[in-house]
Amino acid sequence: MKINSPLEAYKYLPQTNCGECGEATCMAFASKLIDRSGKPTQCPPLVKEKKFAKKLAELERLLAPEIREITIGVGDRAVKIGGDDVLYRHKLTFFNKTKMFYDVTDTMDEAALLERTKKVADFRKFYVGRNLLLDGVAIRSVSNDPEKFAAAVKKVSEVGIPMILCSFNPAVLKAGLEVAKDKNPLIYAANKDNWKEVGELALEYNVPVVVSAFNDLDGLKTLAKTFAEAGIKDIVLDPGTYPSGQGLKDSFTNFLKIRRAGIMGDTEIAYPIMALPITAWMAGISDPVSAAYWETAMAAIFTIRYGDIMILHSLEPYATLPEVHLAETIYTDPRTPVAVDSKMYKVGEPDENSPVLFTTNFALTYYTVESDLSSNGITCWLLAVDTDGIGVEAAAAGGQLTADKVKDAFEKSGFDLKKDVTHNTVIIPGLAARLQGDLEDKLGARVLVGPMDSGRLPGWFEKNWPPK
């Protein structure tokens, strides 16, 4: 993105405040463009009126991310990689979190192939209000047989998740593309020996392609430039991922050099980067648990330092869970705390005799409390108070959680402690105990101080509920 101020974007808008984009003013729409929650094409006058054609083209150029954004796959499960504008998250945010693809081979029998593919497709981990997923499958041609590879690709494509077709043999890649040409797979990879044939395949089938040059940045840049000049736009860079020692250090340094150059304006290398933690299994580690451990460590290294897409092997929970959790954490937008809606929630099927509690609307706090309650079979009413997405202790200390805020939250939720429950009692977090007296005055209700940690709620309820 070449501009970072709404005022700069505003110059390219119609400046009529017509409201057709859904915003009250053109300046409000300009703000959406800068924070990337809106697109120039969402302004109807820019698109429809010929006099704005040049402004639209220039605005799209200025707003385009420094690192090219690429889509892999089709439909609801399609994934985007790249699209970043900064080297450090605190300067804006990182976009399009690292995508995790897990390998299968064309020598696996059909049952094992489908079982592993479906394991990737069906993976779900609920975390802070959302499901974390694995992103796709990388089909490796071990046989080097076009027919076998095509058969494997066909079976995997039926599951409906994004694919990477992996072979250095253009004939094998072509066979795979023939059966998956409408699935927009990523093809891996073009190198100094096969670049011409693989480039032709990328153009013929209009699919994204990986260019690969292990520990040779000049060669990698030359390949990327050659492909771009040939009209191939969707390019992914593979600078090589060595699993240990000096090679791993060099790989890490190469990732830094590539991303820094791309962000600083070198358009010839401003593409997403592929990491290959799967090489941990080629490092001579005989114990599969140790190999998976090292693969996960490598995945962590390159998630933190600009790996946009990865190919991995282990599907054990001790490997996949750290991988997806770290990616989710690194790519959380620091500009906006993760928050739930401020309202009254039901835990189980509460009635007029059920206890009433509140916590803040910081998502991690809310879901921790909700989980501790539901997992212990505690049926209750749980109010999320709007604290701008800040946790209980910090919000109570900083003034975002006050008796007035809690009273307002009850009123906005439409919940009346005197009418909707028989006990006229509310339980507050132990970390907000200072609010007890003020809340009793504001709410006209009995206020009980709960434990400091929601994990202690079951024991607290045994001793203190129902109130005497």
Curated annotation (Swiss-Prot):
Keywords: 4Fe-4S, Cobalt, Iron, Iron-sulfur, Metal-binding, Methanogenesis, Methyltransferase, Transferase
Protein name: Acetyl-CoA decarbonylase/synthase complex subunit gamma 2
UniProt-annotated binding residues for [4Fe-4S] cluster: 18, 21, 26, 43
Entry's cofactor comment: Binds 1 [4Fe-4S] cluster.
GO biological process: acetyl-CoA catabolic process; methanogenesis, from acetate; methylation
Keyword presence, Flavoprotein: no
EC number: 2.1.1.245
SUBUNIT field: Heterodimer of delta and gamma chains. The ACDS complex is made up of alpha, epsilon, beta, gamma and delta chains with a probable stoichiometry of (alpha(2)epsilon(2))(4)-beta(8)-(gamma(1)delta(1))(8).
Lineage: Archaea, Methanobacteriati, Methanobacteriota, Stenosarchaea group, Methanomicrobia
Function: Part of a complex that catalyzes the reversible cleavage of acetyl-CoA, allowing growth on acetate as sole source of carbon and energy.
Source superkingdom: Archaea
The species this protein was found in: Methanosarcina thermophila
PROSITE patterns, per database record: 4FE4S
